[in-house]
């Protein structure tokens, strides 16, 4: 949720650093979400098709982390927009599969409690992440370190997801089973 809320709150500000008008910022901000919404559907469908979840969460998070790091390089607007678009694709593709994990592992009351806990912790990340980005931006005067913070958060997500995949868990059914 750190990346989801981080890109949602701060992408317009990152784009604004290129000196664009508010209308241009608005249009450019919509582009990553257009591609991310398409990727989200396709990636979720692919995960259902082959019945795999862990790597369908970890790989997009890796993409998002690499893209956030790429966007921190101070590249021209077109390159930064490409990087932010890939970051959005990675985040939203991961989210499309992520929510199937707790219910695949937990059942009954445990599933309800597990989903509540995951949602609560995620919302804390959604609260803290954008605030941390703001503090970093204010302290450094640019978004470079803040975007690297987001890259690091995605790397933690990849590691945690891969570690969860190494734990024995019941088979995850394919869609329609």
Task: Please name every model-derived segment.
Residues 30-34, 116-124:
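Transmembrane alpha-helical cores of Major Facilitator Superfamily
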Residues 21, 134-153:
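A membrane-interface helix-boundary motif in multi-pass transporters
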Residues 22-23, 108-118:
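Loop-to-transmembrane helix entry/capping segments in MFS-fold secondary transporters
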Residues 51, 101-112, 141:
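Paired intracellular helix-loop junctions of major facilitator superfamily
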Residues 49-101:
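C-terminal transmembrane helical hairpin of 12-TM major facilitator-type secondary transporters
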Residues 39-52, 137:
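Helix-to-loop junctions at the C-terminal end of transmembrane segments
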Residues 148-177:
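Multi-pass alpha-helical transporter architecture, strongest
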Residues 1-45, 95, 99, 129-130:
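Extracytoplasmic gate region of multi-pass secondary transporters
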């Amino acid at each position: 949720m750190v990346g989801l809320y981080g890109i949602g709150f701060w992408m317009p500000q990152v784009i604004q650093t290129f000196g664009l008008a508010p209308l241009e910022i608005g249009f450019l901000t919509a582009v990553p979400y257009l591609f991310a919404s398409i990727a989200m559907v396709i990636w979720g469908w692919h995960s259902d098709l082959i019945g795999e979840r862990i790597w369908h969460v970890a790989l997009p998070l890796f993409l998002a982390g690499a893209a956030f790091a790429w966007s921190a390089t101070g590249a021209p607007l077109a390159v930064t927009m490409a990087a932010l678009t890939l970051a959005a694709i990675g985040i939203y593709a991961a989210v499309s599969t992520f929510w199937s994990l707790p219910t695949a592992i937990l059942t009954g009351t445990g599933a309800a409690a597990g989903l509540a806990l995951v949602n609560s912790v995620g919302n804390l990340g959604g609260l803290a992440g954008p605030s941390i980005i703001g503090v970093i931006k204010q302290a450094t005067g640019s978004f470079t370190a803040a975007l690297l913070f987001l890259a690091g958060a995605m790397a933690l997500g990849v590691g945690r997801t891969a570690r969860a995949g190494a734990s024995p868990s019941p088979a995850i059914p394919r869609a329609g089973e």
